[in-house]
Design a protein with these regions (language model features):
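Positively charged n-region of N-terminal signal peptides that target proteins for export
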Residues: 1-4
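Long, low-complexity intrinsically disordered regions enriched in Ser/Thr, Asp/Glu, Pro/Gly
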Residues: 18-19, 206
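Short beta-strand edge/turn micro-motifs at domain boundaries
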Residues: 126, 131-206
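Surface-exposed acidic loop/strand-edge motifs in secreted or periplasmic proteins
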Residues: 65-145
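Short, low-complexity N-terminal intrinsically disordered segments enriched in polar/charged residues
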Residues: 21-54, 58, 66, 70, ...
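Hydrophobic alpha-helical targeting segments used for export or membrane insertion
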Residues: 9-11
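C-terminal motif of bacterial Sec signal peptides marking the signal peptidase cleavage site
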Residues: 13-16
Length: 206
């Protein structure tokens, strides 16, 4: 009888121990999955942003346009303040504008308020890849670096969306650091993949 009691007790301890191990293993797997998912989101978006920067640097606009959101397209903003009424550009329209050398209206110049009417290539050179952002001095994910004198409404315009920023600080002593410049990409998930929905240039304006 005593032997039977000891055997039952040992079996209970064994089962309980195994259950604790199984529960701990499940918790560990859940925690690891959450960490992996968080890292994967950041890494995948940063990889897409880098692909966009490389495409802009080498002027491969087919690749750049392939990153546009398939149905929403991309909104281009020449300054930190995003005009939510400004139309979005689909990839096919962006490429057609390059091929046909069309002049597009991209927004308005800060200060004068005059319409920014430019062909795609000159706009890219002035308001998108105006610096070597692929090798930017500072980079960030979901955080702002450059802060100018215009309202930055990115988070209000694109709540809960991820973005990257590439920033060069000012170098001309004459301007006391105000000649900084930055580029931001905003991404949105579509069919389990991330695509670009906004390209925002920012700088200090007079």
């Amino acid at each position: 009888m005593r032997c039977l009691f000891i055997a039952i007790l040992a079996l209970s301890l064994f089962i309980g121990c195994n259950r604790n191990k199984a529960t701990q293993a499940q918790e560990d797997r859940a925690g690891a999955h959450a960490i992996t998912q968080k890292i994967t989101t950041k890494d995948s978006i940063e990889a897409l942003a880098k692909k966009a920067l490389i495409a802009l640097k080498v002027k491969d606009y087919q690749v750049f346009a392939s990153l546009f959101h398939p149905t929403e397209g991309v909104r281009f903003s020449p300054y930190g303040f995003i005009d939510p009424t400004h139309k979005k550009v689909l990839a096919k329209d962006f490429l057609e504008a390059i091929d046909r050398n069309w002049t597009l209206t991209w927004g308005h110049f800060d200060g004068s308020g005059d319409a920014i009417k430019m062909k795609v290539n000159p706009y890219i050179e002035k308001f998108i890849y105006n610096a070597d952002y692929l090798h930017a001095g500072q980079k960030s994910f979901d955080a702002f670096i450059g802060q100018g004198n215009t309202i930055n409404n990115l988070k209000e315009t694109y709540p809960q969306l991820h973005f990257t920023e590439y920033y060069f600080k000012g170098t001309n002593e004459k301007y006391k650091g105000l000649d900084w410049t930055s580029l931001r990409f905003v991404f949105k998930k579509y069919n389990n993949a991330y695509y670009m929905v906004a390209v925002i240039h920012d700088q200090w304006t007079n």
